[in-house]
Amino acid sequence: MKPVIETHALCKSYHSRPVVDHLNLTVPEGCVYGFLGPNGAGKSTTMKMLLGLVHPTGGSVELLGHTLNEANRIALLRQTGSLIESPSGYLHLTARENLSIVADLKDVDRKDISRVLEIVHLTKDADRKVGQYSLGMKQRLGIAMALLGSPKLLILDEPTNGLDPAGIQEMRSLIAVSYTHLT
């Protein structure tokens, strides 16, 4: 299996304090990986570097067989779905309208919106304003945004953050179902 993510001596420091220190990571295609560690260990920073949202202090990132750089970042991100820390969306718009914006940004056919709404069980609430959603519904909308366009790579940072035990179990099941839709 070829790797979908590779890092080589990846580093990030803030004010001379190393947060990520020479990380070498290989994630093969078709695998599910997770980062575990205490707050401040660099998990979110690593994921942001994988997406080109934070520039590393040193080292390199390869996504889908290409070294991540400014010239190819947008093209690689169009093949990647992500949810970093907490879902973002326009609260005054409906879920369907939010997904339409993301579809346009990712250059994805809007017909895919119905598919991802069904996967995350938001079809019946698709035309409600996101500001009326519970935290769990917002998390599911974030997963739907990440799944638009059937990405080759899915990066989720704390997708169960702030959920109660039932919500955590629901999100884990949703992630497992989402994974089967990627492979």
Region spans (language model):
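Helix-to-loop junction immediately C-terminal to a conserved catalytic motif
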Residues: 51
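Conserved small/polar residues in nucleotide/adenosyl-binding loops
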Residues: 180-183
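Conserved ABC ATPase "signature" region
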Residues: 100, 104, 110-125
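Conserved ABC transporter NBD signature motif
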Residues: 59-69, 75-76
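Catalytic Walker B motif of ABC-type/P-loop ATPase nucleotide-binding domains
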Residues: 154-158
